[in-house]
């Protein structure tokens, strides 16, 4: 992967991050298979400076389908569910001495985008630097959620988020420290992508033609720039168990392309990730606020965000409460080697009291069989944007509705 030199304007940010945040573990992408991306510690650099390093390249990908049943969708009920294409992706990961790199591109029905792409340098065993489009250090990583559908915080850009910038990570002993600076969200014009077609949710420009049906009364021209992130985590180990406590924070600007004005956005997260034998427990609290420039009055109560080629409105201030409990059961049933039973809960507390809060409970099983991974999820949700009637999609994370919805989904993924 070719990477351009850093602009001069990044140098102060880099020096600040290096001194203030000697940095933490990078996340990954949502694949239940053993992580494909080469870790910096897997460097193939030779012991002798006289020996040329070798290029170690891994190529891979995945093909996934969904089997979906939605009780709230009349057509889906009449057809007794649908078997649909989810995604096809290609990955390239590797190392060259102390250098490492990773790239992933995804294809969906009708759109495509760059999921991630970065290059990095391993300064020492517990310190590395990476630049490009990579996971934002915020909350439990690589994922808080166990289910294929994620928790509600993901849909507001606070879980498994990817942006374009520079990250430093430092992992001394049981500590994990991260500092990062992102010039902007990932650019989506690469290889035919569109503004709305991206993997993770970001504040984006949109028009009333896009979201007039969902209450957008005027065109929006906002986007994310100049975001700083910091994360500190500590893992406490005792008697074969481990508990990781982490605190994350981010702050940046929202830029209005029409007025050229900017305003601030920020978020904080406090999390616990515990591994107790075969059980895993995760708890998290997120507080956030986004102040959209160029808007006044009630229009400031929501921002426009998008991913997967679909925009919607999100409450500009609120909290997310999340929890997850999982149990890993190794088995020997033909090709099946493991079941992971889980229950994920999340709650979206929106700042305008008149708006209906969001809630989600997802109970499921992840079945592992060699390269085949199957998520089986049963969802009971309110104002989950991807589990409700299409007419409510654009306002689910804003005004919302009182309706509860039930769905059942199986995601079948072949990873290679």
Task: Cite the ranges covered by each PLM segment.
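Sequence/structural signature of outer-membrane beta-barrel proteins
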Residues: 66-74, 106-110, 138-140, 145, ...
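Outer membrane beta-barrel
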Residues: 51-72, 79-188, 193, 234-237, ...
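Transmembrane beta-barrel strands of outer-membrane/channel proteins
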Residues: 61-69, 103-105, 131-133, 179-183, ...
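Solvent-exposed loop/turn segments connecting transmembrane beta-strands
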Residues: 80-82, 105-114, 159-161, 222-224, ...
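N-terminal periplasmic/intermembrane-space "pro-region" immediately following the signal or transit peptide
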Residues: 21-64, 416
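Outer-membrane beta-barrel "beta-signal"
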Residues: 323, 402-416
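Flexible, surface-exposed loop regions and adjacent strand-edge segments
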Residues: 76-80, 146-151, 194-202, 262-264, ...
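Signature for the C-terminal beta-barrel architecture of outer-membrane proteins
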Residues: 44-56, 121-129, 158-299, 303-321, ...
């Amino acid at each position: 992967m070719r990477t351009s030199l850093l602009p001069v304007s990044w140098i102060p940010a880099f020096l600040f991050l290096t001194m203030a945040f000697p940095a933490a573990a990078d996340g990954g992408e949502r694949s239940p298979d053993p992580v494909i991306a080469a870790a910096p510690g897997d460097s193939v650099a030779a012991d002798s400076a006289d020996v040329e390093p070798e290029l170690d390249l891994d190529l891979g990908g995945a093909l996934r389908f969904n089997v979906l049943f939605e009780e709230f969708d009349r057509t889906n009920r009449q057809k007794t569910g649908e078997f649909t294409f989810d995604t096809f992706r290609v990955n390239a990961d590797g190392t060259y001495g102390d250098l490492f790199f990773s790239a992933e591109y995804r294809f969906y029905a009708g759109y495509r985008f760059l999921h991630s792409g970065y290059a990095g340098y391993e300064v020492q065993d517990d310190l590395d630097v990476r630049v490009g489009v990579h996971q934002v250090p915020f909350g439990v990583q690589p994922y808080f959620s166990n289910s294929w559908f994620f928790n509600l915080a993901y849909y507001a850009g606070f879980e498994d988020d990817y942006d374009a910038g520079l990250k430093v990570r430092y992992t001394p002993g049981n500590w994990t420290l991260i500092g990062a600076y992102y010039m902007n969200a990932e650019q989506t014009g690469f290889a035919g992508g569109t503004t709305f077609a991206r993997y993770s949710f970001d504040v984006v420009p949109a028009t009333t033609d896009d979201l007039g049906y969902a209450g957008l009364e005027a065109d929006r021209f906002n986007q994310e720039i100049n975001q700083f992130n910091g994360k500190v985590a500590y893992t406490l180990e005792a008697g074969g168990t481990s508990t990781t406590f982490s605190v994350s924070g981010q702050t940046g600007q929202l830029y209005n392309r029409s007025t050229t004005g900017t305003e601030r956005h920020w978020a904080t997260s406090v999390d616990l990730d515990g591994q107790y034998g075969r059980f895993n427990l995760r708890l998290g609290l997120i507080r956030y606020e986004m102040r959209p420039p160029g808007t006044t009055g009630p229009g400031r109560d929501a921002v426009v965000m998008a991913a997967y080629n679909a925009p919607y409105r999100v409450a500009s201030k609120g909290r997310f409460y999340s929890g997850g409990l999982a149990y890993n059961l190794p088995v020997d049933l033909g090709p099946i080697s493991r079941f992971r039973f889980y229950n994920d809960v999340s709650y979206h507390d929106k700042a305008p009291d008149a708006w209906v809060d969001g809630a989600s409970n997802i109970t499921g099983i992840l079945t592992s069989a060699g390269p085949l991974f199957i998520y089986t999820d049963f969802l009971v949700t309110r104002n989950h944007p991807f589990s409700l009637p299409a007419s409510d999609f654009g306002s689910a994370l804003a005004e919302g509705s009182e309706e509860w919805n039930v769905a059942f989904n199986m995601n079948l993924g072949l990873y290679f």
